[in-house]
């Protein structure tokens, strides 16, 4: 399996190269040359680690299959507490795919616990011995998951950049207290898009790359622009379908719809890949918060990033430039020149419009909707009072949209992307309770409401010392990168 850039089909690489490099030289994203076809029904009989190995090996064809089997087995075992890809019934034929039972309590763990192993193996496959400098822009969850996955990995340095005031206090503390000799964390003045743009500029700066190469350092990414982030996320769509099949809720071939709280479009795009591989996915429902740029695009075909930015209670979705949409545009149009033109228009004008036939093709699979802050709070309370189910703010966005888009007789799986204990004040307030200013006091009150303890890794943050408190401007991200030595 080869990969090529969404903006230049002539730039072909192996999966090892795609994972080690992260982003194509001209700024495009790597996509597979084809969609491998699998026996989805047979895969439904596997446990999660074996299922993960079976899916990722279809794309990572230059990796030793034995390595992938061992890597997935060691990744999705104890760290996920026996709940990797756990599907919880909520109401009728609506389910929650709980993706927050990993070490950092967010869905990003599924990729970022495996991805460090993939990077180290990629360098071995390529015969590369240089230091890898990973730059990560985060709206909250990716940063901690990447830090946890990559800390103290030999030959790797990682720097994470998050927007000041753009995460929950628990998310900030998860990053600021991170242990490890090879990690660094910076708050960036501005929003997530400012941080992400700053990181992308570093990746696209040939002078920076040349200077780092002199020091035997190469840049890479742990954001979902890196193929190594996307491929592990395909797996849990198969896992959700398998659980419904094995429980007798569906027969093989029945469609299942998925509603995904969406920011950077990577998680929902993984569902598109699962569908293209042969999994009977029906509709993929893109759920946005008040930063509803994707809802507008999927409705009109015009993407407009120049708009008011809202800080919401679902900060991991507070994004106006949704990077992975570029991959979908390539798959639908099949044209690197067309995609390059659209991305050029976005960079220069802040917007682009796709052809009507492109929008129609996208709408065959993708539906969309968005939730206001009031609706998010109402959804948290409704699920708690009506279904005895406690969810976080991002999941509530998806529950609200899922109810609007639910098809009669078709199961709906809502991707639950983070633990409610990562956002204790917002969840408590949604339940109609007065939340204390201190997040840990709020967490204790939420434990009483939930009837069970908060994840140990979150509760332990209260005792940890903060290591990182530097605040920088987006333009200083380049200075940070150039400050590294081999």
Task: Please report, for each region that a protein language model flagged, where it lies by residue.
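PLP-dependent amino-acid enzyme catalytic core
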Residues: 1-486
């Amino acid at each position: 399996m080869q990969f090529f850039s969404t903006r230049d089909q002539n730039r072909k690489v192996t999966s090892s190269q795609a994972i080690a490099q992260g982003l194509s030289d001209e700024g495009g994203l790597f996509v597979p040359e084809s969609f491998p076809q699998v026996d989805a029904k047979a895969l439904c009989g596997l446990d999660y680690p074996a299922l993960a190995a079976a899916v990722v090996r279809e794309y990572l064809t230059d990796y030793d299959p034995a390595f992938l089997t061992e890597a997935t087995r060691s990744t999705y075992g104890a760290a996920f507490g026996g709940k990797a890809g756990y599907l919880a019934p909520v109401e009728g034929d609506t389910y929650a795919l709980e993706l927050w039972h990993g070490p950092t309590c967010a869905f990003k763990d599924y990729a970022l616990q495996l991805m460090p192993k993939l990077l180290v193996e990629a360098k071995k496959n390529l015969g590369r011995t240089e230091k890898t400098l990973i730059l990560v822009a985060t709206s909250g969850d990716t940063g901690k998951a990447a830090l946890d996955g990559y800390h103290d990995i030999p030959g790797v340095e990682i720097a994470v950049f998050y927007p000041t005031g753009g995460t929950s206090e628990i998310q900030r503390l998860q990053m600021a207290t991170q242990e490890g000799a090879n990690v660094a964390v910076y708050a960036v003045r501005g929003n997530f898009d400012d941080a992400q743009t700053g990181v992308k500029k570093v990746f696209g700066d040939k002078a920076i790359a040349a200077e780092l190469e002199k020091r035997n350092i190469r840049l890479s990414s742990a954001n979902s622009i890196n193929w190594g982030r996307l491929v592990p996320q395909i797996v849990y769509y198969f896992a959700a379908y398998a659980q419904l099949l094995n429980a007798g809720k569906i027969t093989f071939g029945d469609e299942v719809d998925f509603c995904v709280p969406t920011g950077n479009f990577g998680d929902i795009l993984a569902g598109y890949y699962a569908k293209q591989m042969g999994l009977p996915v029906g509709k993929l429902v893109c759920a946005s918060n008040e930063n509803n740029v994707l809802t507008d695009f999927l409705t009109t075909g015009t993407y407009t990033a120049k708009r008011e930015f809202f800080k919401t209670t679902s900060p991991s979705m507070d994004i106006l430039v949704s990077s992975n949409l570029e991959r979908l545009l390539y798959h639908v149009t099949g044209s690197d020149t067309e995609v390059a033109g659209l991305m050029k228009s976005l960079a220069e004008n802040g917007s682009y419009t796709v052809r009507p036939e492109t929008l129609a093709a996208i709408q065959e699979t993708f539906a969309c909707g968005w939730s206001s802050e009031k609706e998010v709070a109402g959804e948290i309370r409704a699920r708690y009072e009506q279904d005895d189910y406690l969810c976080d703010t991002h999941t509530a966005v998806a529950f609200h949209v899922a109810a609007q888009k639910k098809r009669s007789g078709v199961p709906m799986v809502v991707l639950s992307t983070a633990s409610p204990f990562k956002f204790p004040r917002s969840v408590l307030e949604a339940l109609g309770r007065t939340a204390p200013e201190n997040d840990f006091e709020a967490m204790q009150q939420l434990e009483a409401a939930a009837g069970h303890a908060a994840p140990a890794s979150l509760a332990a943050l209260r005792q940890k010392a903060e290591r990182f408190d530097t605040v920088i401007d987006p333009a200083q991200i380049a200075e940070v990168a150039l400050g590294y030595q081999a």
